[in-house]
Amino acid sequence: MSLKEVITSLKNDFHSINKEIDSMKENNEKQEDKIFQEIKKLKLEMELLRKDNLSFKTTIQSLSDSINSLSSVESTYDSDLYYDDDEYSTIYL
């Protein structure tokens, strides 16, 4: 092989390697874009879950408040009841 042929072969190899590098860069950029899109999607899902969780907590708190309110009404009602032992424990209001 002559020196000119070797240089031409090396240039072709170099050109081929540069094409591969460019292709790899492009693939990496595409993968990065996919990863960033997935991260965005996951962040949105996390935010929705946080909101759902907050809504759930609010609902639970509301139910708890309602139960406490009912308990308070029940205890008020119970305090109006009394038993007459002479009448076989009949309940009077």
UniProtKB/Swiss-Prot annotation:
Keywords: Coiled coil. The keyword Coiled coil applies. Residues 2-58 form a coiled coil. Belongs to the UPF0521 family. This is UPF0521 protein A. It comes from Dictyostelium discoideum.
